[in-house]
Amino acid sequence: MNRMEQHPILTFDKGRKVTFTFEGKTLEGYEGESVAAALHANGVRVLHESEVKHRPRGLFCAIGNCSSCLMKVDGVPNVRTCVEPLREGLRVERQEGHAHPKLDVEIESRLGERRNLIETDVLVVGAGPAGMCAAIEAAKGGAKVILVERGQKLGGQLVKQTHKFFGSEKQQAGTRGVTIAEGLEKEIAENPNIQLWVNTSALGYYANGIVMVERDHQVEGILPKRVIVATGAFEKNLVFPNNDLPGVYGAGAVQTLMNLEGVLPGKDVIMIGAGNIGLIVSYQLLQAGVNVKAVVEAAPRIGGYEVHAAKLRRAGVPILTSHTVSYAYGEGKLEGAVIHQLDEKWQPIPGTEKDIKADIMCMAVGLSPLVELFFQAGCEMKFVPELGGYVPALDDCRRTSVGTIYAAGDASGVEEASSAMLTGKIAGLSAANDLAAVDGFEEKFADYRGQLQMLRQGPGGAKIRSGVEKLKEGKCVDYAK
């Protein structure tokens, strides 16, 4: 078993022990944890095969964005097992590629009565730091809010963060992300203006402002007066041979397994990327008892804060700048990787190859905003590399070119969690004020904007400031409609 029994910071509140079957074999897990986590805890890393070449596939993102975890569950194909809750008696099977069930021409006669649209003042999509703060702020302003979250747990990146936050007292400096998430969840539970829907995915934005969602395997239609999109971001990968082997994870997936599910991803890890995420997750891996063999960074210097790098160096972890991955290797799963040094022109230096044995490779090489809903709604989109890719054009209230839609958090540009919370507060406050004047709006708005600008000061915020300025001035690539 690969479950963590002890952690220096976290405690794992496991649900009821249940049994399920994988390929006919009976296994044990805990009710409510993801199917993929339960399989990992039982030593199952290969979840399905690729469609054409039948290559093994394993968990990568662990938040429902990629297709690496698709499996057949209780006979239903293409289930995202990284967000599918485990229940007693589930039947889990591998599948080859994306299953293509036969077209059921009689399905319409079995769908039952069409459901009425559910109306609300504000719909918030995503219950990470931005979405939670947006929902709370809109509800405080008097709006009726539906907050949807495709996973079972609230908090997004916050519940994965065991380190203490920087900033000022207003940004809860000195408080761990997991503790901040608990406080926000309590506020949501106690606010009668907020309906919380977990296990709910936004499927699309349709004509007349209707948002269709899948809630516990049932499709619902929501007609909100305002929509706040706080869908977060997805992790990038690098291109190198065998980058798809089971054991190659996004950094967020490793955090999800360790810090949410209490499951060890493996024994030995190579971390790719020395930004804040790579450095922080490396230290979290050490806390969980995983051996960090090296942190590999292509740039000539680390991109994260020195305070995070210093912790790793004190623990004896080598940080190899001007290095990258040549290739990974392994029979059906990761067994190691060869890295090499780069010259000043980012070209490989012959003879510098190093072979590192590891069963985990953790990719912390950047994030891109999740923006599909903005595209579907016809929002004006811009490509801003400093913000992670395509983002919606916004005014100071976080309002998009479609006046009823707002953006918050990493969906509008990848930043730190503290910034995401503030953009959520601005979006929630503005959406509520659009519907009915909020008492003290100007003072609150100015306060949140001021805090956000303060967080973006200094060398660490230069990239974000540049991206925001480009977006505001239109000095970026337009999305071709």
Can you name each region flagged by the protein language model?
Residues 1-23, 30-481:
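Residues forming the flavin
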